[in-house]
Amino acid sequence: MQSKKKKILVVDDEPDILEFLQEILEDEGYSVVTTDKGEYVEKLHDGGLPHLILLDMLLSGKDGRQIVKYLKSQEETKHIPVIMCSAHPSAEKTARAAGAEDFLAKPFEIDELLAKVAQYL
């Protein structure tokens, strides 16, 4: 359990995945903000910047790679680690090329998710 709550922004267009990830991460003591759209900028400022972003690669209306490129180009957000997720394991190279620090292939094991999150926090 984290002694100091770290904030994680989870961006995915599947409500079930958002709910699942929020529950798992909150059970581990993290503060979690979720959004189902790529309109991430608004969420970044709700209560301060997150310490980590979990980002689905394919969102309705927005490409996760574009979001990462934008985040990494901005002074205030370029330091925030981004873990991209996709149902296509072959997308890891693309995610890293876009600027993501790490990648999770869906479906993933809870232990794998928590280990990657802990690695960056």
Set out the residue ranges of the language-model regions.
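Alpha4 helix (beta4-alpha4-beta5 surface) of REC/receiver domains from two-component response regulators
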Residues: 63-66, 88-104, 112-115
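Two-component/phosphorelay signaling modules centered on CheY-like receiver
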Residues: 15-33
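Acidic, metal-coordinating helix/loop segments flanking the phosphotransfer/catalytic sites
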Residues: 34-52
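Active-site residues of response regulator receiver
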Residues: 56
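Receiver (REC) domain switch/active-site region of two-component response regulators
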Residues: 109
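Hydrophobic residue at a beta-alpha junction
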Residues: 35-36, 59-62, 71
